[in-house]
Amino acid sequence: MVYNLNQNLRTLEKLQYQKATGKKFRVPSDDPIGASKSLKFHTDISKLEQYQRNAEDAMSWMTDTESALGEIGEVLKRAYELTIDVANGTKKAPEDLQKVKEEIDQLREHLIQIGNTTYAGRHIFSGYKTDQPLLNEDGTYNIDLIMKKDENDADKKAEIFEYNVGVSETVKVNTLGGKVFGKIGLDNEGKPIFVEEPDYTSDIDEKEMPYLIAVFDALSDELDSGTNPDIIQNSIKRLQDSHEQVLAVRSEVGAKMNRLEMTEKKIGAQINNVNELLSYNEDVDMAEISMQIAMAENVYISSLMTGAKIIQPTLVQFLT
């Protein structure tokens, strides 16, 4: 009888604990299967939350990249407008040409600053060398960059880093500076050798000249020495081609951002689903538990009353 009383009391205590905590069990021995499921659900949530943090960091990185590319586009647009004015003769007086040259030089400096843009202290266009700026103050490359994989050398891979945003799912985050600024060869006098198709894919060596910077240098030199119509027209075409390249790269970044946005939504939905499963596995139904407590209390009180009647002492037993 005492055993049954204790069992009823333990049942009541367990139910009262569940109501107080809102959880079905407090130690694995209460529900080994449920505890095992909860452990798995918590592990899944931790992984998904890490994927979510990775996706958010990747999105922030690419947002800054997209913003920098947009800024480069604005620089090229302004340079194009100035060059068109010179080509049309709108600005042909020496003092006007000098003002155009000064603005072109300032735009060139701004390009260098954009090329060295950072996100959270990391240079976004510098490949693996995020602790180093892409460009030197003179406009040359400050670092070496591997732009593409070498099929003959397994260790030589493009300096693209990826974030894990799911099981076996990654997203390429960075944009290599060579893809935006390109590179150009120099002659024996150190003058750029312009070709029909700019090079945006070859590996970059430190101190090499970016194509985009060379375009501004050539235009500035021409404005300083005279305005040869052929050279001005060539500068217009180079600015147009450079702008198209920047737009193409910006479009790639935008496509990755769109995909990443969908991935973030998917991860959020997965976290909600697992949280629902975890809640179903762990959390008690308050209405149901209140009813069970009321029933357990009645059972316990009834057992106490029954026990009291069974072991009720007689007057003789009480006196002795």
Model-flagged regions — what are they?
Residues 1-131, 221-320:
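Amphipathic alpha-helical polymerization modules
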Residues 12, 16-19, 23, 115-245, ...:
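Polar, low-complexity export/assembly segments characteristic of proteins
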